[in-house]
Amino acid sequence: MTTPKDQQHVPRPAQILFVCHPLTGHITPALRVASELHRRGWPVSFLGPTTHQHRISASGVDFIPLQDEADIDDLLYYSPDNPNPPVPWYHWKLWYERALVDVEKHCLEPIPAQWRCVKQALASLQERSPDIPTVVISEAFFHGILPLYFGAALPDGVKRPKTLCLSVTPPAIRSVDLPPFGYPLPFSQSSEGRARNAQAWDIFGEETSSLKKLFHSKLAEAGATHFPSGPILDGTNYTSHDAILQIGVPSFEYPRSDWPQQFQFLGFLPLGAPPPNGYPNLPSWWDQLTSTKKRVVVVAQGTVETDPNDLIIPTIEALRERDDVQVVAIMGRKGATLPDGFAQSRNALVTDYLHYDAVLPYAHVWVHNGGYGAITHGIAHGVPMVVAGEGQDKPENVKRVRFSGIGVGLGTPRPGIENLKISLDAVLGDARFKTRVDVLRQETEDLDCFGRVEDALLKVVAR
C-alpha cells in the first residue's frame, strides 16, 4: 500500500480552499484536516480570520485573510470584557437566546463579506494554478459559500468549484426523527414522536422567522436569485454541498432514518503526534502527575465559559476528601488563576493552560463543558466523561454523551458540588462507561478519518 509519505511529491488533481466558521472550536479541527492534506501533498489554502493567522500559517497551509465584517475575533466576541458586545446584555441572556444571536452575528450577517472573500480567493487560486481545479472544503457553519448554490455569479472566467461540507459539530440537519437543534425533546421514530418533532419544527420556524428573513436578505445582497424554503438550521448549509463529511462515528449519533444521500462519517480526528521534544511549558507539578498511583480526574473550564466557579471549583470540592483521586484542573486561558482566598485541596493540581493530548493519557475521568472538541479528545484517549455546559452546540453534545453511554451528561454550566460528586462517583465506579468509550475509540480508528477525506476529494474531482 502506498503511504501518505510516499505520495507527498505525487502531483494532486486539484488544489483545495478551506473556508471555516471563525470560531476557535471550528477552526481547530478544520485546520487539523487542512494541515494533514497539505502533509500528503495537496496544495491547500485556508480562508480564515486574522486573529488565527499565525496558527494557520504555522500549520504549513497558505493563509488567506477574511476581510471586513467577515473577520471576526471570537475570543473578543465572547469575552465579558468586550467593550462592544454583540447585543446589549448578551452575557445575561438565556443560552438559547445567545445561540440565536450567534447565528445572526457569525453565520448570517457576514454572508456578503464572506462571499466576496470566497470569490477573490477562487479567482486568485485559479490565476495561480490555471491547469488544475479548485475544490472548496467548507466547514458546515461557514454560510458565505451558500450564495454559490442560490444563483450568485462568480467573477468572469472563474470556474465553478466542487464543494465538500466538513462538519465538526453534531450534524444540524433536519430529520423526521429529531426536533430542532437544541430542543429538549428526545430522539423518537414512533409516529407520536415524529408528529411531536414536526410540530416543534413548525414552532421553531415561527420563532426564527426574523432570522430566515435576514438569511434571505443577506443571500440577496450577495447576489442570490433564489432562496431556501425551510427554516434556518434545517441543514441547507450541509445538503447544498456535493458531499457531507461528518467528523464522528455512528455510535455517537442517533440512528436516524433519513441521512442525506451524500452524508458519510469520517471517524473522529486521530491523535496528533506529540512534539519531537515533548509538550512545551508543562507545569512544575508534571512529574507528580505522571508518577501518581491514584485515579486521575481532569477538569477543564474551557475558553468560552471561563468562570472557575462554574465547573473547576465545584469539581475540586466534590473530590476534596477523596485521597484515592488526583484532580488536575485546567483554567483554559494563559495566566488564569483560581480566585484569591480559595483554599486549594491537597489532591488538586492547577494550571492555567495545558494541551489536552498531554494530560488525557493519564486520566480516568474527563470533566468539561461539553464542547465537541473536548468530547472527541476524550474518545480518542478512551476516557469516560462528565459533561456540563450549555449554549452553542453543547446541549446536543450532552444528549449524545448520554445516548452513547460514554459518560454522564449534566446539561448545565453550573452543576454544583453535589451533582458533580454523584456523577463522578458513578463514572469512577462503573466500568461500563470505560467499555463504551473504548468501543467508540475503536470505531473511529477503524474508519480512518484523514483517508476518508482524501478519498472524498478524489471522487469529487473525478466526477
Locate each region found by the language model:
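Phosphate/nucleotide-donor binding subsite
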Residues: 62-134, 194-201, 343-344
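C-terminal amphipathic helix plus adjacent low-complexity
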Residues: 2-7, 418-463
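A donor-sugar binding/catalytic signature common to diverse glycosyltransferases
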Residues: 34, 352-400
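Donor-nucleotide binding loops and adjacent catalytic segments primarily
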Residues: 247-365
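N-terminal subdomain of nucleotide-sugar transferases
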Residues: 2-67
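Conserved nucleotide-sugar donor-interacting segment of glycosyltransferase catalytic cores
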Residues: 107-198, 250-253
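Long, low-complexity segments enriched in small/aliphatic residues
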Residues: 222-266
